[in-house]
């Protein structure tokens, strides 16, 4: 398996990641997220879904942080008692918020594609709804580590 194939396979099988953002005071904020990778656009989408939240989507800490500082990291990892099967993938990149009331046509198509990818990977979204906002990550650096012995 080539490195590129290994990377795509591992990313696509990962069910959860951890999104790291930073506020203006350089205080980190890390949360668990679901995500999809869009092969056509070489970017990641993270929904701001309709599960219960403490505040409106536009007021969430992750959203405000990305609006103030677009530098983000998405960490995907696997823990196994057999340490030869451990891995992590860290994607560093620029985050942006898609969605809201005033959408351009190309943004609408992008949201529709992301929603389809997310519903395909996570069928739970057919019941709870994905929401009107997404985080888009354009990767700048990908760090891969595994211990496959």
Question: What are these model-derived regions, one by one?
Answer:
Residues 33-37:
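A short, well-structured catalytic beta-strand-centered motif of the EAL phosphodiesterase domain
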Residues 39-79:
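A short mixed-secondary-structure module that forms the rim of ligand-binding clefts
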Residues 11-23, 72-76:
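A short, Trp-centered hydrophobic/proline-enriched beta-strand micro-motif
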Residues 18, 43-45, 73, 136, ...:
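General beta-strand recognition
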Residues 9-12, 66:
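Soluble sensory domains of the PAS superfamily and closely related sensory modules
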Residues 2, 57, 79, 83-149:
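Charged, gly/pro-rich active-site loop segments
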Residues 1, 13-19, 117-119:
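Short Pro/Gly-enriched beta-strand edge/turn motifs at strand-loop
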């Amino acid at each position: 398996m080539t490195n590129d194939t290994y990377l795509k396979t591992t990313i696509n099988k990962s069910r959860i990641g951890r999104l790291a953002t930073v506020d203006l005071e350089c205080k980190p904020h890390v949360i668990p997220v679901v995500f999809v990778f869009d092969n056509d656009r070489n970017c990641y989408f993270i929904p701001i879904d309709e599960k219960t939240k403490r505040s409106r989507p536009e007021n969430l800490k992750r959203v405000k942080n990305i609006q103030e500082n677009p530098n983000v990291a998405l960490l995907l990892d696997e823990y196994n008692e057999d340490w030869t099967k451990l891995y992590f993938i860290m994607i560093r990149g620029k985050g942006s918020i898609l969605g809201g009331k005033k959408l351009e046509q190309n943004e609408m198509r992008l949201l529709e594609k992301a929603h389809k990818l997310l519903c395909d990977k996570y069928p739970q979204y057919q019941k709870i709804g994905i929401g009107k906002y997404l985080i888009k990550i354009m990767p700048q650096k990908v760090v891969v580590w595994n211990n496959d012995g």
